[in-house]
Amino acid sequence: MSGKRADGGHDGAGDVALIIAVKRLAAAKTRLAPVFSARTRESVVLAMLTDTLTAATRVPSLGSITVITPDEAAAAAAAGLGADVLADPTPEGHPDPLNNAIATAERAVSGSFTNIVALQGDLPALQSQELAEAVAAARAHRRSFVADRLATGTAALFAFGTRLDPRFGSDSSARHRSSGAIELTGAWPGLRCDVDTPTDLAAARRLGVGAATARAIAAH
């Protein structure tokens, strides 16, 4: 992504590269199965990615946005919003597919950017100002992170002039903290509200989800 978009969002002025890794939609968010059919779940996952990207494209400090995914629908949606897209080369059965995908994307953008953030793609209540404030706070540290609303996961991992060293997965908040990353303490409720379960989705809806997610849920 580069330059100014027609909707007024700013695409190329920043010095930070953002990475979002997205798994195959059919395999994503299986814990939402109690409330959505498989087809609707895929639509909701894609909508949450759309709302996350829409918020991110309005953050002036982001100079590029890259989505790495093996999923054609997710890739098309990301490209339609102006993101760069990488095909995820992670093989089936890889023991750590998410972190491998993030590391792959990091290598791809590191030639142009030394400041990188890995962001979850399931943040339908994300506000652009929240992400902008988190990026600004992260500049005070070489490596930092924002925990999710339950303080067990990681919503965003930042690296300024150093490697991301991503440790997403179970108890990633503790793993990032123990690896030396500084925990950022801003409120940022939408940034912290990733959606894995029906309870998470209810929390996001209370905050106010983006237009794409609202439409996907309404169609259910």
Swiss-Prot record:
Pfam families: CofC (PF01983). One of its GO terms (biological process) is F420-0 metabolic process. Gene3D superfamilies: Spore Coat Polysaccharide Biosynthesis Protein SpsA, Chain A (3.90.550.10). It is an enzyme of class 2 (transferase). Pathway: Cofactor biosynthesis; coenzyme F420 biosynthesis. It catalyses: phosphoenolpyruvate + GTP + H(+) = enolpyruvoyl-2-diphospho-5'-guanosine + diphosphate. GO terms for molecular function: GTP binding; phospholactate guanylyltransferase activity. Its EC number is 2.7.7.105. Phosphoenolpyruvate binds at residues 154, 169, 172. Keywords: GTP-binding, Nucleotide-binding, Nucleotidyltransferase, Transferase. Guanylyltransferase that catalyzes the activation of phosphoenolpyruvate (PEP) as enolpyruvoyl-2-diphospho-5'-guanosine, via the condensation of PEP with GTP. It is involved in the biosynthesis of coenzyme F420, a hydride carrier cofactor. Belongs to the CofC family. This is Phosphoenolpyruvate guanylyltransferase. It comes from Mycolicibacterium paratuberculosis (strain ATCC BAA-968 / K-10).
